[in-house]
Amino acid sequence: PDENLLTAVLNSIPYDIRDVNVTMGLPMSGSLFYDMMSHVASIQMHAVFRKGQWFFYHKPVWDLFSNDVFRKASDEKTEDIVSEIRKEAGYYIPMEKLSGSPLMDTVFRVSVTDPKSASASQISAFAEYLKEVVRTVAPLVSDDPGMAVEMEFAKEYHKGLTMIGDCLFGSGKKRGLLPSTFVRLLAQMLGTVSVPFRGEPLKGL
């Protein structure tokens, strides 16, 4: 069986079907949560500073707005901001226009100030930023039964960030990487992760 199709199949099951027996693993790389975090990382990688303020490139921003996890985490204020950004359809979006709700303020701040620098402090800030996004989004969707599987991926994503942080900065180490290298390393590490469901019902996750 193709594990990459499992998330889509599970998401299509009606809510009135309460117990689903799953006998295969769910790959991180095919999850909505991984997709969302990939867009979040891309937003950081494409931030630019012009005329005294930060801007975000539109494509990863719009991709994030279309992600189901992000949409379910959005409150009314976030939805209003997203609607306004879509109407304006700017190529580069000022950071100030992407603020105004706890979710937006967490996501749309800059942790990668110089993508060409292999600064250890910048990578540490980038990793902590990604962890904060996970910690912010997960509670906002945790009560949604349709997001139960994605919450398992949120836990694994956070674990992966902690692990890579320990490798780079544990025991007093300060290993610098280019942000692009960090993103690739994280993708390689998390892309092979799967959440195992071996003959267990999905209820209660």
Q: What is the meaning of each model-derived region?
A:
Residues 1-205:
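Polyanion-engaging groove/track-forming segments
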